[in-house]
Curated annotation (Swiss-Prot):
Transmembrane region(s): 3-23, 45-65, 78-98, 104-124, 130-150
SUBUNIT field: Homotetramer. May also form homodimer.
Protein name: Translocator protein 2
UniProt-annotated location(s): Endoplasmic reticulum membrane; Cell membrane
InterPro entries registered for this protein in UniProt: TspO/MBR-related_sf, TspO_MBR
Function: Cholesterol-binding protein involved in the redistribution of cholesterol from lipid droplets to the endoplasmic reticulum. Required to meet cholesterol demands during erythropoietic differentiation. May play a role in transport processes at the plasma membrane of erythrocytes, including regulating VDAC-mediated ATP export, and import of the heme precursors protoporphyrin IX and 5-aminolevulinic acid.
Domain notes: The C-terminal region mediates cholesterol-binding.
GO molecular function list: 5-aminolevulinic acid transmembrane transporter activity; cholesterol binding
Keywords (A to Z) from UniProt: Cell membrane, Endoplasmic reticulum, Membrane, Receptor, Transmembrane, Transmembrane helix, Transport
Length: 170
C-alpha cells in the first residue's frame, strides 16, 4: 500500500480526533451509570471497534479510488462524494451524541448514515467488490450503535423504561 493508501486509511479518523479536541470539555459520562444498558459493550471495546471499522472503511475507499484511476477526476465524484457525505454524517453523530447529548437527533442521523452506507456499498460493488464487502462490518456496527442510541432515546422520553439501579443486599 502506497502513501495514498495510508492517507485513505487515516482520513476517517480525522473527524473523531477533531471532535474530541474541540469538545472534550463538554463530554461527560451522561450515558454511563444507571443509564448504561446491560448489553452495551465497555467504552474501550466501543473505541477499538470504531477504530478498526474506520480503518477498514478507509482502506475500502482507497481500493475504489485506485480502481477508478486515482487522482481527482470526474469518475470519482459520485463514489467518493457519497463516501465523504457519510463520513461527515458519522462525525456529526459523535457531536450530537457525546456533546449535545441528543440521542433522538443522533438516532435520526444514524438511520440516514445507514442508508448512505448501503448506497455507497451498492455504488462501490461494480467498481470493487471487496471494497463493497468491507462495508458490511460497518453496517453491522451501525445496527448495534443504532440500537443503543434508540434505547437511550426511548429512556430519555419515558423514564419508566430507564434501567433502575439494583440494590445490593449484604
Amino acid at each position: 500500500m502506497r502513501l495514498q493508501g495510508a492517507i485513505f486509511v487515516l482520513l476517517p479518523h480525522l473527524g473523531p480526533i477533531l471532535v474530541w479536541l474541540f469538545t472534550r470539555d463538554h463530554m461527560s459520562g451522561w450515558c454511563e451509570g444507571p443509564r448504561m444498558l446491560s448489553w452495551c459493550p465497555f467504552y474501550k471495546v466501543l473505541l477499538l471497534v470504531q477504530t478498526a471499522i474506520y480503518s477498514v472503511v478507509g482502506y475500502a475507499s482507497y481500493l475504489v479510488w485506485k480502481d477508478l484511476g486515482g487522482g481527482l477526476g470526474w469518475p470519482l465524484a459520485l463514489p467518493l462524494g457519497l463516501y465523504a457525505v457519510q463520513l461527515t454524517i458519522s462525525w456529526t453523530v459523535l457531536v450530537l451524541f457525546f456533546t449535545v447529548h441528543n440521542p433522538g437527533l443522533a438516532l435520526l442521523h444514524l438511520l440516514l448514515l445507514y442508508g448512505l452506507v448501503v448506497s455507497t456499498a451498492l455504488i462501490w460493488h461494480p467498481i470493487n467488490k471487496l471494497a463493497a464487502l468491507l462495508l458490511l462490518p460497518y453496517l453491522a456496527w451501525l445496527t448495534v450503535t443504532s440500537a443503543l442510541t434508540y434505547h437511550l432515546w426511548r429512556d430519555s422520553l419515558c423514564p419508566v423504561h430507564q434501567p433502575q439501579p439494583t440494590e445490593k443486599s449484604d
